[in-house]
Amino acid sequence: MLIRGMKGLGDCIYQRAFIRQLRGPVFLETPWPELYQDMPHVRCVRPATELRTQAKNIQRHAKWVRPPSGLGTLNIRYGGAGIYNGMRSAFRVQPGVLDLPGFGSPPVTGRYVLVRPVTVRAEWRADARNPLPEYIAAAAAEMRRRGYQVVSVADLQPGHEWALEPLPAADVRYHAGELPVEQLLALLQGAAAVIGGIGWVVPASIAAGVPAWVVCGGQGGYNAPELITDRAMKTSQLTFAVPDNFCRCTERQHTCDKRIANYDQRFAEWADRLPAVV
């Protein structure tokens, strides 16, 4: 079977739950073969992509497999019905466990929180989805006040991807894509908590079982919590901060109302539930 899979990092994490249910061999087009290293029935096929971070990871690898001719093909997509519901239809199976391979020791020691700043990509702008950057910055500052290290991760490049101010204060910054995906996910797996907006940190946090504070922005027609999570996932460690007037649009650029009342208090209550730094 040839699977023309989703290409985003987050989508490729979600896919794991379905691909593990398929009988092998499975020939999978993916920019992120690292995510399937613990699945011996998966053969990774080089995909075509023009997106910067995907192409950069593809260039790291040489051992791509050429699928045999005549294979049946599944094209994986999802729409407004939700990520897992769309994948159920595309894969034609129910999901298994959503997890990650073990990626070893993180590049940072001690008690730390992983923070994903708010960024904009020129090649795929999703301004409406982004939360207000001051909410991420406030959360990072509060965690530093509580004694945690803050580690901020991004892959910024002038003219291609940039962060929105205010940037979260951080003890360690990897903002130039220094971490390959294995180290990035090892960093997440070793974190005391994760803070960020909608994106790859959501499925990665669920898969790793790490507490996550996820700040929603807009574009709720695709990115509402109930659409990016599912009853089949273990989401007890996931907390969403949702705008009071959550916009259910499906536009990537729209002036959604992203304000959240009593945000600082709500975040402090969430942080109080984390184990104290000693």
Where are these regions (language model features)?
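Catalytic machinery of carbohydrate-active enzymes
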Residues: 1-278
